[in-house]
């Protein structure tokens, strides 16, 4: 027996299968090209259903065994289109999205450096200004101390001149216009009025007996007047007098007072006149 050959396919059927395969390849290439050019776009929709005349004829397995291998290979290509795999993002896309961050970070770092530099400059200028002010204050403090020492020296010099003027003339000069004796100064240690007479009375010599008690010496009265005038002048000027000077001044005036010759003569006359009836002098 001779093997029976399958009937040759119809030419129109072979042409339709070839056209369908070409259409599927064209759609796949177009989808792949669109996906590469627009990666962010959604996945393309599957191709629409083809018209009935473009679809391949479904045959039974018995008929497929009898089909020519060349025709069957073309028919297998006409199967349902498979979606192409999504391409992985290439290295060219990452610099586009990541390139902005280095620029912004570098710009922010430059701004921070500029702000820090400006802050350091302001801080240094402020520190220099404070140092200059401290130097000026130190200079002013030294000048103030020098003026204060000079003022104290001038006060002592004025007090000495005032005491000598009172000793030579015995007149009190007029008070300055800016000094008021009715308002005593609390910040200065002015000697109390009661301290002067107590010192003079303690340092003065004992008065003589007899007629000398009735006639006090004129030198002591004049010295008391001068001392009181001196105290009034010092209190009026509002100046502090050195305690050593006052003690020396009072000591020089009262402790070493010389006796006058007329006082000794008066004492001898009194002793001569006051004699007892028996002719002997009265000794007190």
Swiss-Prot record:
Q: Does the keyword Amino-acid biosynthesis apply?
A: no
Residue ranges with Polar residues bias: 57-67
Q: Name one GO molecular function term.
A: transcription cis-regulatory region binding
Region described as Leucine-zipper: 130-161
Q: Where in the cell is it found?
A: Nucleus
- Outline the extent of the bZIP domain: 102-165
Q: Which domain of life is it from?
A: Eukaryota
Positions of the region Basic motif? 103-126
- Please list the residue ranges that the record marks as compositionally biased, kind Low complexity: 26-40, 108-118, 193-222
Query: Which InterPro entries does this UniProt record tie to the protein?
Result: AP-1-like, bZIP, bZIP_sf
> Could you give one GO CC term from the UniProt record?
RNA polymerase II transcription regulator complex
Q: Which UniProt keywords apply?
A: DNA-binding, Nucleus, Transcription, Transcription regulation
The yes or no answer to whether the keyword Transferase is present is: no
Task: Report residue spans for region: Disordered.
Answer: 1-121, 174-284
**Chain intervals with Pro residues compositional bias:** 1-10, 41-54
Q: Which Pfam families match?
A: bZIP_1 (PF00170)
Role summary: Putative transcription factor.
**Which family, according to the similarity comment?**
Belongs to the bZIP family.
Its recorded name reads: Putative transcription factor kapC
Q: Which organism is it from?
A: Aspergillus oryzae (strain ATCC 42149 / RIB 40) (Yellow koji mold)
